[in-house]
């Protein structure tokens, strides 16, 4: 029965109750149909397959497709992606199996991709190269450089690969390139100039440097920098919104005070805006990324991320050539921090990056000059330094710099100032390993010995000595190793010498140091240096280890002779089992078809030959084998071999890390890149663990529930911290004062109190008298003076300058009922603020004296429980009214009263009764209405979803750091320093000011009632409608209005 017939039988069984089976169906087939129908369901006449989802109780229903033509069309639609791209086999099957299902779906996807010509052409291009000549051509090696002149033609013929691989390579077809020029039918040719963009940027940059046509001045750290507003707004959304909000779009010149910004991080961004080249010190990459994120410069952030990806994917090596020192001591590493060396050259890397479309080059500058071999276009091969016999410490060798990323810009590594270096914790990134077993302390310079030994030994001889012949069996030592170990066989001939010698060879001393930023590269480097083993050898080795574990103690001589019966005749290895011995013999029988044309080594696989040829491309030859023999002799005298401790030092901050992976994670702090991003909200994180914790917050289900109370939590750690409240046991203790905390966040906040704060606040605001400890606090404070509000509520579109104010406001939308203090009546929308209020600021807890929270007015005797209400009331007595109406000039003591007053001009009534739909001007009037007529529907809190009237907390007249200059005002500015202020004056305002000036001459001043206030409003509205001033001038008694505050929300 085919798949279509079986699906039709299941469909008939589920839909036809009278005759569920076809006539003539056997009993065994009926049982199979009933069993299979348990996984299917029919909805709307269509058969669906129910598949169980992992970690979920529901089933995923997939439509079963019965028609072959429809199946072919669905596979084709899933294989083609957006833009005409072709998906892989796994992607096609994964997208298709989300909605549809039928038996053999994966096989049909495989067959379709095999018939796709574009996918097969892509597969041919990605086919690995197995021919040695093609590998040499790809790596840029010359065949004549490694061959001897007296070799015969028969030997040269052996270097080529088998004829089967040659025939496959001959079938490869070159991909032709087509250039298309689109020409309209009317004869209009559209072409673009690739040099136009750079030419325009060059002219703009020259105009900026020569102060031509500049219309904005940037004040940063007391210095002025000229620029163009159009260029700044095109590169940064921050400046664009600033110019639009301050009305500096159409004005001639504007001055922007950038207090809190640093020149070291801002000037590279300014240069990038005019040259599209980002040049900065690698140490300040984090500051540049943070400032670019603040200014909303997405291109700079992409460049910083691409730099980090280049270091991760391409394994970029920061190469620094200098003096290499070896240290041997019995003491700890901390004892050598004080030991210094003669002053040398300190290497500081400066990275220069161009745009993403620019050509990528990595230029290696050694002491300001290029190596001779690189200038000639050939890889440099330097002789290996020869370590002294007394020196036991070693430095990891420098790996060859890989090919740069094709999408990155120009990167150059340069050297700068001269500073002394430390013996162990050096700032240039060189990692030294110290043997603690040796009693003497030796400090040597490998660069001096390099000049002595480099002239005697050629790179080819060193490469031939260091690389043993792989044609021999792994059990037998090579010829080169025999010649090297003849002097040491008499003193110590144990099998442990070879392993210890290989460890010393892996940690051989080379000139230079490196920082490899890739996960797990240290282990891969050790595996690559070891002898490559095939799959058969690895299986045989596992069998040998298993046999040694299960090997029983010797009982008699007969059993021991039987165990040693399986012995290899070629390499001498002994196997306890016959199967392991047979698998081992297959290794010797298999032919080595791949031969290196440079050193005559033979390999069993093409991948092994490729890895071997890469070693020839290294610029520095490996350490000579003579250093290994001397180190073996020195170690042979001691009975115990000390273990080498390796540490990795950050060249930027000098921090010492135990693992290479820890250094890679540590470098994320210096680069400022957060590689892990949330797909829901877009928030980025440095660590993957932080992203997982953040993603759990988006999940609506709280899996972990407390057994003692009703609360549930998203993470297990939150549940454990909550359980500590019930049990009273806490695992977070302060090491300084011994205080315990239930949560780790509380401990981290507590530890900041023990940190000494600087005595002087180094960052001062130029607009007010406030000062701050950090620059980021000053930048955020400047948002209030500049009027920038980057934090916007997604519910009511209300904007804030401070993030904490925005967060508190967003919480008010999600909380149905606020947290209210039972004593003072203060309300909080955040539980943390409410708990802090109850714990610290109120009501005599923890031995405090009970505070009198009621504040009494000295003039009228009125009592207040909230401080802001008391201050507002005192402003009314003292006559401080910072909130002034721009329409009629009436001033108020608080913003709420001004909003209520402005709504009398506009006629807006935003507070609508949800029962009878009557609108009111404020929340107090609406609450009175609902209390009188709809007593059962009185809410706890009345808030507006979107408040159209937003005033500053300190008044409507606020000083701004952006000053608008006109052509007439520039002459006045040159005469002397004056404060500039912009005032918008209309015809209606002038008439109101004249009326106010006329009434101020009256000696008697009295307080207006609500009826008098409405007369003032009617006067302003009458002026707007064109009535005369004399009709209502008599109704005006005074303009000084004093109204008690009536809060909108209770």
From Swiss-Prot:
Pfam families: BTB, Integrase_H2C2, zf-C2H2, zf-C2H2_6. Residues 143-173, 373-514, 543-563, 617-641 are annotated as: Disordered. Residues 478-501, 553-563 have a biased composition (Basic and acidic residues). Its main location: nucleus. SUPFAM superfamilies: beta-beta-alpha zinc fingers, POZ domain. SMART domains: BTB, ZnF_C2H2. Keywords: DNA-binding, Metal-binding, Nucleus, Repeat, Transcription, Transcription regulation, Zinc, Zinc-finger. Residues 157-168, 378-399, 623-638 have a biased composition (Low complexity). A zinc finger (C2H2-type) spans 566-588, 594-616, 648-670, 676-698, 704-726, 732-754, 763-785, 791-813, 819-843, 855-877, 883-905, 911-934. It comes from the Eukaryota. Gene3D superfamilies: 1.10.340.70, Classic Zinc Finger (3.30.160.60), Potassium Channel Kv1.1, Chain A (3.30.710.10). May be involved in transcriptional regulation. This is Zinc finger and BTB domain-containing protein 11. It comes from Mus musculus.
């Amino acid at each position: 029965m085919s798949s279509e017939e079986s699906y039709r039988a299941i469909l008939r069984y589920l839909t036809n109750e009278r005759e569920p089976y076809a006539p003539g169906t056997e009993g065994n087939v009926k049982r199979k149909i009933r069993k299979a129908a348990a996984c299917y369901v029919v909805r709307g006449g269509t058969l669906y397959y129910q598949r169980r989802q992992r970690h979920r109780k529901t089933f995923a229903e997939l439509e079963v497709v019965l028609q072959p033509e429809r199946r072919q069309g669905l596979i084709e639609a899933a294989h083609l992606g957006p833009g005409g791209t072709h998906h892989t086999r796994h992607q096609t099957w994964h997208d298709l199996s989300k909605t549809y299902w039928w038996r053999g779906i994966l096989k049909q996807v495989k067959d379709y991709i095999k018939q796709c010509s574009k996918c097969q052409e892509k597969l041919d291009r990605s086919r690995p190269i197995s021919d040695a000549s093609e590998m040499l051509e790809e790596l840029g090696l010359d065949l004549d450089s490694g061959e001897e002149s007296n070799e015969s033609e028969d030997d040269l013929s052996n270097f080529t690969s088998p004829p089967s691989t040659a025939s496959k390579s001959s079938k490869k077809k070159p991909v032709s390139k087509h250039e298309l020029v689109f020409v309209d039918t009317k004869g209009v040719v559209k072409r673009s100039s690739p040099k136009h963009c750079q030419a325009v940027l060059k002219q703009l940059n020259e105009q900026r440097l020569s102060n031509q046509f500049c219309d904005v001045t940037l004040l940063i750290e007391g210095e002025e920098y000229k620029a163009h507003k159009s260029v700044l707004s095109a590169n940064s959304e921050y400046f664009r919104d600033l110019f639009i909000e301050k009305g500096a779009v159409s004005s001639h010149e504007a001055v922007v005070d950038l207090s809190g910004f640093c020149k070291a991080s801002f000037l590279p961004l300014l240069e990038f805006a005019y040259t599209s080249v980002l040049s900065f010190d690698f140490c300040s990459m984090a500051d540049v990324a943070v400032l670019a994120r603040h200014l909303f410069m997405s291109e700079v952030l992409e460049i910083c991320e691409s730099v980090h990806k280049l270091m991760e994917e391409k394994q970029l090596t920061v190469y620094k050539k200098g003096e290499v020192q070896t240290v041997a001591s019995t003491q700890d590493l901390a004892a050598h921090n004080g030991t210094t060396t003669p002053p040398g050259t300190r290497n500081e890397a400066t990275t220069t990056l161009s745009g993403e479309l620019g050509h990528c080059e990595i230029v290696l500058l050694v002491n300001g000059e290029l190596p001779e071999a690189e200038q000639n276009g050939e890889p440099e091969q330097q002789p290996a330094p020869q370590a002294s016999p007394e020196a036991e410490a070693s430095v990891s060798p420098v790996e060859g710099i890989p090919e740069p990323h094709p999408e990155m810009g120009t990167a150059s590594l340069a050297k700068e100032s001269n500073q002394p270096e430390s013996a162990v914790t050096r700032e240039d990134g060189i990692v030294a390993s110290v043997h603690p077993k040796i009693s003497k302390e030796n400090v040597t310079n490998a660069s001096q010995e390099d000049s002595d030994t480099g002239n005697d030994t050629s790179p080819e001889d060193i490469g031939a000595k260091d690389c043993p012949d792989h044609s021999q069996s792994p059990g037998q030592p090579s010829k080169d190793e025999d010649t090297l170990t003849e002097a040491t066989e008499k003193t110590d001939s144990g099998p442990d010498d070879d392993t210890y010698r290989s460890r010393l060879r892996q940690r051989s001393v080379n000139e230079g140091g490196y920082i490899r930023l890739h996960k797990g590269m240290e282990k891969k480097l050790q595996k690559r240096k070891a002898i490559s083993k095939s799959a058969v050898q690895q299986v045989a080795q596992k069998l040998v280890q298993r046999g040694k574990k299960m090997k029983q103690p010797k009982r008699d001589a007969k059993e021991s002779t039987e165990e040693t019966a399986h012995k290899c005749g070629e390499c001498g290895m002994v196997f306890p089992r016959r199967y392991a011995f047979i698998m081992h013999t297959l290794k010797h029988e298999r032919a080595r078809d791949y031969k290196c044309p440079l050193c005559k080594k033979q390999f069993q696989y093409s991948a092994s030959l490729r890895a071997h040829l890469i070693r020839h491309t290294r610029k520095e030859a490996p350490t000579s084998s003579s250093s290994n023999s001397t180190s073996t002799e020195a170690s042979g005298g001691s009975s115990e071999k000390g273990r080498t401790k390796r540490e990795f030092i950050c060249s930027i901050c000098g921090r010492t890390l135990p693992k290479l992976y820890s250094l890679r994670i540590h470098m994320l702090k210096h680069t400022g890149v957060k590689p892990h991003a949330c797909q829901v909200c877009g928030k980025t994180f440095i660590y993957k663990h932080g992203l997982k914790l953040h993603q759990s917050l988006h999940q609506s289900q709280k899996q972990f529930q407390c057994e003692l109370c009703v609360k549930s939590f998203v993470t297990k750690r939150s549940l454990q911290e909550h359980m500590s409240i019930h049990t009273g046991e806490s695992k977070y203790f302060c090491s300084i004062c011994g205080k315990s905390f239930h949560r780790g966040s509380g401990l981290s906040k507590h530890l900041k109190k023990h940190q000494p704060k600087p005595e002087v606040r180094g960052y001062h605001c130029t607009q007010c008298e406030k000062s701050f400890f950090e620059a980021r606090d000053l930048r955020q404070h400047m948002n209030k003076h500049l009027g920038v509000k980057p934090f916007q509520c997604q519910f009511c579109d209300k904007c804030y300058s401070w993030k904490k104010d925005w967060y508190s406001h967003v919480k008010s939308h999600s909380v149905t009922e606020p947290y209210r203090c039972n004593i003072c009546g203060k309300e909080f929308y955040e539980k943390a603020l409410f708990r802090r209020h109850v714990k610290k600021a109120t009501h005599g807890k923890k031995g405090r004296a009970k505070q009198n929270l009621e504040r009494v007015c000295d003039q009228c005797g009125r009592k207040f429980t909230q401080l802001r209400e008391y201050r507002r009331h005192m402003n009314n007595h003292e006559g401080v009214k910072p909130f002034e109406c721009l329409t009629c000039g009436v001033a108020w003591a608080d913003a709420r009263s001004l909003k209520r007053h402005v709504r009398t001009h506009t006629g807006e009534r935003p507070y609508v009764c949800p029962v009878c739909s009557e609108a009111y001007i404020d929340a107090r009037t609406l609450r009175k209405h609902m209390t009188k007529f709809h007593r059962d529907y009185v809410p706890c809190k009345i808030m507006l979803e979107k408040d159209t009237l937003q005033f500053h907390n300190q008044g409507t007249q606020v000083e701004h750091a952006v000053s608008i200059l006109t052509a007439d005002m520039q002459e006045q500015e040159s005469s002397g320093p004056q404060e500039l202020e912009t005032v918008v004056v209309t015809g209606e305002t002038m008439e109101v000011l004249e009326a106010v000036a006329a009434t101020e001459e009256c000696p008697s001043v009295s307080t207006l009632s609500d009826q008098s206030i409405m007369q003032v409003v009617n006067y302003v509205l009458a002026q707007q409608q064109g009535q005369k001033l004399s009709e209502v001038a008599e109704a005006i008694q005074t303009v000084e209005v004093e109204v008690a505050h009536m809060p909108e929300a209770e």
